[in-house]
Amino acid sequence: PNLTEYLKEQGLGVGLISTDSLSSQTIAAFSSHTSNEENTEEIILEQTRSGVDLFLGSGRDLYRRYKDNFISESYSYYDKFENIDINQEKIIGVFDEEKDETTSKTIPTLDKLTKLAVDFMENNFPNGYFLVVECGHIDKMSHNVNILDMVQYLENFDKAIAGTYESLKDDPTCAIIVASNHETGRLVYNGETK
């Protein structure tokens, strides 16, 4: 079993959220067993049977084809953030792909996704849960060596973590771990700027 399957076997809740598509590498690694990140259909079909309690991210147009698969596995399926009812057993929320500021198509900000996810997990899993929060666009902007946009996404990630810390800081059983899976774009701080 993968980590999330093991945690489900232990009776814990599992939530996976990202600003990127839910079929992207990080989320797929926690919710499928495919050996190729380009096996999108296989990833999504495995996600429907994964037992993950909460999926939030982008990919609405892609996931629409699999809506019935998720519903048949007891997921409440949402494609509008404002319609999500956290009083459900399992949720998948898939939103518009991330776009530039010239379009109206954007997924909810990471801090909003994270707050909803924490509320859902806290309400439904009193014995504990595992929540992955990914800002996939930090990596994308770094690949493009777009430092300004990368910093904006990093600030939103920081806001999401700060909000989570504030809501959970009095819980002695909670651990918040912040990690990077790799560096891209050769971003280097030289220590000279203020």
Describe every region a protein language model picked out:
Residues 1, 5-8, 12-25:
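Mobile, glycine-rich extracellular loop/lid and propeptide segments
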Residues 23-194:
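A post-motif C-terminal structural segment
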